[in-house]
Amino acid sequence: MLLYNVTVGIDKDKEQEWLDYMTNKHIRDVMNTGLFVQSKLYKVLHDQEDGTISYSVQYFAKNIEDVQQYLEVFAPVLIEEHRKKFVNRHIAFRTLLEEVKFDG
């Protein structure tokens, strides 16, 4: 299992608008690609001194090919839509993680 994690810092005064957009549109658009099997949204529980609130948006994929297809075919348009809607009001970084299985 792979985890494509997007951590977003959003200005406090745009937080509710951003949450509405993410939960009603963006996350659904990503999931509707059919390339991820599950998504989760977490709020980061520490105060930011720069006036932002941080969230982790997590998308789970079965294999690297699905993630690569998403990044090549769908991500450019979806990222640009998000950027335009919240221009100069957010920062985002993306991380791809592979599950490490162990006993315990």
Stretches found by the model and what they are:
Residues 3-9, 42-73:
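Short, well-ordered beta-strand segments in beta-rich or mixed alpha/beta enzyme
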Residues 15-17, 48, 66-68, 103-104:
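Intrinsically disordered, low-complexity acidic/polar segments
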Residues 15-40, 78-80:
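Short amphipathic alpha-helical segments
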Residues 32-33, 62, 103-104:
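A short, structured loop/turn motif at beta-sheet edges
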Residues 35, 72-75, 83, 87:
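A generic structural signal for secondary-structure junctions
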Residues 40-50, 81-104:
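Glycine-rich beta-strand-turn "strand-cap" elements at beta-sheet edges
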